[in-house]
């Protein structure tokens, strides 16, 4: 089974990080947060947005990008940026571990990082003259593309009605 790893590089907005944590809990993805952050981890907004799922969340913090790289030296990372040369759908996300990195809300990922990884830098297409999508929305789009490519492995396949049955005519 493929393990999805979401990497947030210096996130700034607690609500976004909380929503991303909730997406990770719902999909079984691991969350990696690279400091510095623009908020304290006990921020009420962060908890309200998603960290009440903390018991179902695999989360790790790193002092900086060098710390992350030292602990994951062989990670194949896909860098998400509005500046990328190709769409995220042009990639086949294979392997046992898939790492998806997203930058801070105000500036994205450092350009030198993108420049050093042209083959694994991707974007989510959107209309011209818009700066970017919301970070938590971008993460959800990317996570579900990886899951789709792996036939939603490990996720519940059907839903249930509370007052009715799908089998009733």
Residue ranges with predicted function:
Residues 1-169:
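Post-transcriptional modification and biogenesis factors for structured RNAs
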